[in-house]
Amino acid sequence: MRIRLLSPVKAFAASVVATALLFGLSAAPAALAADDRLQFTGTTLSGAPFDGASLQGKPAVLWFWTPWCPFCNAEAPGVSQVAAANPTVTFVGIAAHSGGAAMQNFVSKYNLNFTNLNDADGSIWARYNVPWQPAYVFYRADGSSTFVNNPTSAMSPQELSDRVTALTA
C-alpha cells in the first residue's frame, strides 16, 4: 500500500474547508424564518379584519392591554405619543378580557390612532404566551423579536421610545 502525502497548498486548502464546515462558514447564513406567531387573524375594534402576516418584514410593536389595567392606563398616553412620533413602525394594540365598548372607550380616551384588535377569546394572547398585561412584542424588520412583560409597573415613555428607535437602527 502506498501513502500519498498532500502538497502544502492542498493541505492548507483542505484545512480551510474543514474549518469552514466545522464552524458553519461554508454557506451564506440562511434568511431568518418567518415568525409563525404572526400567522393570526383578528378583528379591529371597528370590525375590520386584520391579518397578522401583514406585519412580516416590517418593524412593529404589539401592545397587549386591557382597559381596566392600571398600568395599561398609565402607559397609554406614552404609547400614543411614541406611535405618532414613529410612523415607520407599525403599532398594533391587542386588547382582551373586556367588552368591546370598554375597549373602544379606552382607545378614544387615550387617542390611540393605530390599529387595535378585539381579542375577545384571548387566542392572540395565547399565541404569544402573554400571561398578563401590559406586555409588548417588538419586531425588527428581519423578523427577530423581543417580548417584554412587566406586570408590576408601566413602561416609561422613554424606555418605549428607546426600544422603538432600536427597531429601525
Description of each model-found segment:
Residues M1-L32:
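Secretory targeting and sorting signals
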Residues S108-L112, A120-A166:
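Thiol/disulfide oxidoreductase modules built on the thioredoxin-like
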Residues D51-N73:
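Short active-site neighborhood of thiol/selenol oxidoreductases, capturing the structured segment around
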Residues L22-G52:
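N-terminal "domain-start" segment that seeds a small globular fold
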Residues N73-Y110, A120:
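Structural microenvironment flanking redox-active thiols in thiol-disulfide oxidoreductases
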Residues V61-L62, F91, Y136:
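Hydrophobic beta-strand anchors of alpha/beta hydrolase catalytic cores
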Residues L38, A60, Q133-P134:
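Short loop/turn microsegments at loop-to-beta-strand junctions
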